[in-house]
Curated annotation (Swiss-Prot):
The gene is def. Its EC number is 3.5.1.88. Binds 1 Fe(2+) ion. Removes the formyl group from the N-terminal Met of newly synthesized proteins. Requires at least a dipeptide for an efficient rate of reaction. N-terminal L-methionine is a prerequisite for activity but the enzyme has broad specificity at other positions. This is Peptide deformylase. The keyword Protein biosynthesis applies.
Length: 165
């Protein structure tokens, strides 16, 4: 396994829509293993393939405390099929180091996709897991945390991190 480079804003790959995965093969399994290792190495709770420069619809998520048994989720071609409620909470991103913001997300989501073996799975999530799944699925559509904040906050972000529009 290898630790991959996490792409940082404003890398253009982060703004592109990821492609549906049509074949589960050895290369994909290696990518999954490398993404898992990369996420844990960065002390993250989720990672999407575009964050490591791969435009494929693949996410890995683990919101369990590090000292407990890990509850790793690997989702291929995930999609949110149902959601309800709203909750405002603090959120950060491995591709936006040093930046956090309060953001409204759905409080409960149902996500369908394939596990790493190609088996269909459905996850009903609330709390931090629901937030992490929504965040990582946003990455698959080229949507970043800063795309969901107010124009004023976005301008302050750009000034602080010295990026252009």
């Amino acid at each position: 396994m290898a630790i991959l480079e996490i792409k940082k804003y404003p890398d253009e790959v982060l703004k592109k829509k990821a492609e549906t995965i049509s074949e589960i093969n050895g290369d994909l399994q290696k990518l999954i293993d490398n993404m898992i290792e990369t996420m844990y190495n960065a002390n993250g709770i989720g990672l999407a393939a575009p964050q490591v420069g791969v435009l494929k619809r693949l996410i890995v998520v683990d919101t369990s405390p590090r000292e407990q048994n890990q509850s790793l989720i690997v989702l291929i071609n995930p999609e949110i099929t149902d959601s309800e409620g709203e909750i405002l909470s603090e959120e950060g991103c491995l591709s936006l180091p040093g930046f956090t913001t309060r953001l409204k997300r759905k409080e409960r989501v149902i996500v369908k996709g394939l596990d790493r073996n190609g088996k269909e799975i459905e996850i009903e999530a609330t709390g931090l897991l629901a937030r992490a799944l929504q965040h990582e699925i946003d990455h698959l559509d080229g949507i970043l945390l800063i795309d969901k904040i107010s124009p004023l906050k976005r301008e302050l972000f750009r000034k602080k991190f010295k990026t252009k529009k």
